[in-house]
């Protein structure tokens, strides 16, 4: 279940896909492909069933729940995983293979940027190209067939700083070359919160980042190159994303983690209000046909459900059931 890798949290693909509608108050959500979305962000303290490192998995806890493989013949493209080598948490080719060989029919995977293996020197704006070079090497290893039929990292989504405006064009060109036919688009995370208490992305976004004229000038460079934009934000920013989608109808926007409904900090005891705000925002985003949504990320530590505090990993009996 490869999207355990964003921070290697504990809830399975089956749980997240079948339980999304129920968890979000019965909202009608659907997906045309099986999406592996099993994520949790870093936290400042270790939760009950997590090891000391917020990035690290807890294999013993995960092993407490063994789920039946559903439709093992169904061909799946995993649209969201990472690769990294952090202190106490390595998730590279071998670990990815463990997940993709768990019994599901994973045909291909898509790598999503996570700040790994940036270039150590050279122009600052070009350092993210190192990540693509690294991932493309992993993809080439997989394409050799030595590691089985799954084509790992067959698509690569990297990073380019859209705050460069028109200047981002040279970074996108370099990313395309480094990807050797696999580069598909970028993610420039814009997670920002008015309370200032939620984790911010390494991009250090500002209030109204997606309205910024220079940022939008950079964004405008994506469509001519047929590149997608992966949107990672918090639910109060959904209306901002809807405006962006209307302004750039030719750019495909892929909304990460169901629009980021938050359940920590000042949002911990306001789930009803959060759902209402999320529902309004996601409905507005849905009006733009150039936006698609990844169903998942509900196990992330910023979310509303505190799965990581349970004695055993959660399990969904039927679609729409509450955990």
Give a label for each model feature.
Residues 80, 109, 156, 222, ...:
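Conserved, mostly hydrophobic/aromatic
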Residues 11-27:
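N-terminal export leaders
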Residues 253-257, 294-297:
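Short acidic/histidine-rich active-site segments
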Residues 34-36, 42:
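Boundary at the C-terminal end of the N-terminal hydrophobic targeting segment
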Residues 16-17, 44-148:
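An N-terminally biased module of ancient metal coordination in phosphate/nucleic-acid-related enzymes
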Residues 60, 262-323:
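H/E-rich (His + Asp/Glu) clusters that bind or coordinate divalent metals
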Residues 48-64, 123-237, 243-247, 259, ...:
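Active-site gating/metal-coordination segments in enzymes
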Residues 1-11:
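N-terminal secretory signal peptides
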